[in-house]
Regions:
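Catalytic binding pocket for nucleotide-activated donors in carbohydrate/polymer assembly enzymes
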Residues: 196-198, 219, 363-444
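Donor nucleotide-activated moiety binding/catalytic core segment of transferases
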Residues: 147, 303-364, 371
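Active-site-proximal region of nucleotide-activated glycan assembly enzymes
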Residues: 131-134, 158, 170-245
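C-terminal alpha-helical cap of glycosyltransferases
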Residues: 448-465
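Nucleotide-activated donor-dependent transferases that construct or modify glycoconjugates
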Residues: 3-15, 41-42, 56-64, 76, ...
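Short N-terminal targeting/anchoring amphipathic segment
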Residues: 8, 144-162, 354-359
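Conserved catalytic-core segment of nucleotide-activated headgroup transferases in glycan assembly
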Residues: 21-22, 26-27, 232-335, 413
Length: 465
């Protein structure tokens, strides 16, 4: 047997837990004789799962890194508008907050620096400042010390977004250790969310590979590995599936009903979610009057702990059954919400035992098509909007929706009056919709989808060989 190669799996935050701790990723790596150590900056105790881990203690970025990170994003979006003559990149900007003195000073600094550096040369300097500053931190020094002690063959970061990933990656590069990062989500690259600069990049698909080179032309094709994402692998693991009777009994569901899943978004993406859920309830009631026996399972966005749905859940408690995601809340920010292995099982069984999903442009379309089930996208604005300047048109104008080969990949709910008829059509025969959705799934994620972890390990092996 070949000697074991030690691979550090860097978890700068909890975002990568689902893909790289709660999937088959670890098991497959061990079967390939890798020594896997999770370099863990999350509160989650991976040792309780039987994994080897090194806890990162007191990780802290340079005081200016967050400012420069935001400057970098603003410059990239500005240059994308100019280079590609496409104003969609303006829509990825978050409005500046001036609610506190500290926030006001920070945003003034960001905007001032951005104004002076909004060129390709300026962007390159900002990227350099980030690296130079991070190399002065205690976090960088401790990371380097850890790497010298353990000498891994490679450092693989689970997410390209967090600034807390910069120092460990730089420390590895400065020691000549190969580094890689995984692009976390299908919509990340057009948003200018990438802060890590590694030796190699692991992407979902050829489409994402093209995006990576489109937005970051300094990345060579040889640095990119198309692997797919472990995000959807759980749908192909039948050991997670409960019988319909078991699932319905466990969550007090009615065996006489067929359920439709309403999948919520975060409050920024869809501030009117609760009103769309109410429209779905009214449509389901119409269908039940025609002889259908339907209910609704509501799965909220895992990072949405708000009370904005309370009124609709109470008003229609005879129709809606909420099944909250089993995520752990460690802090108030969205990236301190940690996924759990139990939630993967809940999500898989929710999909397996519902007829279809309704949402606003979510990647749940791919989770459902993995089970050969359709998705309906909401495509209208409610009359009394929570935020007057918000519109569904903004959502579907985002770049990642341009990957859709055919608009027939989903059912489009263009008004409240259309919901009942579209759902009825899907319940009677959804084969064409599912077929087109499957084609879209193949565009955004390398197939077979169940072999993503296998391809990632093969790519790691190729890099270190």
């Amino acid at each position: 047997m070949t000697p074991k190669h030690k691979i550090f799996i860097l978890l700068p935050d909890g975002i990568g837990l689902r893909n790289f701790a709660f999937s088959n990723f670890y098991k497959i790596g061990k079967e390939k004789n890798f020594e896997i150590i999770y370099w863990n900056n999350t509160p989650f105790q991976l040792s309780e799962l039987g994994f080897d881990e090194l806890k990162i203690k007191k990780a802290k970025t340079h005081p200016l890194t967050d400012i420069f990170k935001n400057v970098r994003k603003k410059i990239e979006l500005h240059l994308n508008v100019q280079k590609h003559n496409d104003t969609v990149y303006h829509s990825y900007r978050f409005p500046d907050s001036y609610k506190t003195i500290k926030g006001s000073i920070k945003n003034c600094a960001i905007n001032t620096i951005t104004a002076f550096y909004s060129t390709e040369k300026g962007l390159k300097k900002i990227r350099g400042y980030i690296k130079d500053n991070e190399r002065t931190t205690q976090y960088y020094k401790e990371s380097k010390k850890t790497l010298k002690q353990h000498r891994p063959a490679m450092v693989f970061c689970t997410n390209q977004r967090p600034a807390l990933g910069i120092a460990p990656i730089l420390a590895a590069q400065d020691l000549g250790i190969p580094t890689a990062t995984f692009i976390f989500s299908w919509d990340n690259l057009p948003k200018a969310t990438m802060i890590l600069e590694t030796d190699y990049y692991f992407v979902w698909s050829d489409s994402m590979k093209n995006e990576l080179q489109f937005y970051y032309p300094y990345i060579d094709e040889k640095q990119i590995f198309v692997t797919g994402t472990p995000q959807f692998e759980n749908h192909f693991n039948n050991s997670n599936l409960l019988s319909r009777a078991e699932f319905f009994n466990q969550y007090d569901l009615d065996l006489n009903l067929r359920y439709i899943c309403y999948s919520g978004d975060d409050s920024t993406t869809c501030p009117d979610d609760a009103y769309y859920l109410e429209d779905l309830v009214l449509a389901v009631k119409q269908l039940n009057e025609k002889g259908f026996q339907l209910g609704i399972i509501f799965r909220r966005c895992p990072v949405d702990f708000s009370n904005r749905f309370d009124w609709v859940l109470e008003k229609y408690k005879n129709v809606i059954v909420p099944l909250d995601p089993k995520w752990d809340r460690i802090g108030k920010e969205w990236n301190t919400m940690l996924p759990t292995a139990a939630d993967l099982i809940l999500q898989t069984n929710t999909i397996a035992h519902t007829e279809m999903v309704v949402n606003l442009g979510s990647s749940m379309v791919f989770d459902y098509v993995a089970h050969n089930k359709p998705c309906a996208f909401i495509n209208y604005d409610v009359k009394n909007k929570t935020q007057k300047n918000w519109s569904v048109k903004k959502i579907y104008n985002y770049v990642h929706f341009r990957s859709m080969p055919s608009p027939k990949a989903v059912l489009w709910l263009n008004s409240p009056d259309e919901i009942a008829s579209e759902i009825e059509s899907a319940l009677r025969d959804s084969r064409l919709t599912v077929c087109d959705a499957a084609d879209w799934f193949k565009v955004i994620n390398q197939h077979p989808a169940k072999l993503a972890s296998e391809r990632i390990w093969k790519s790691i092996q190729a890099i270190i060989s």
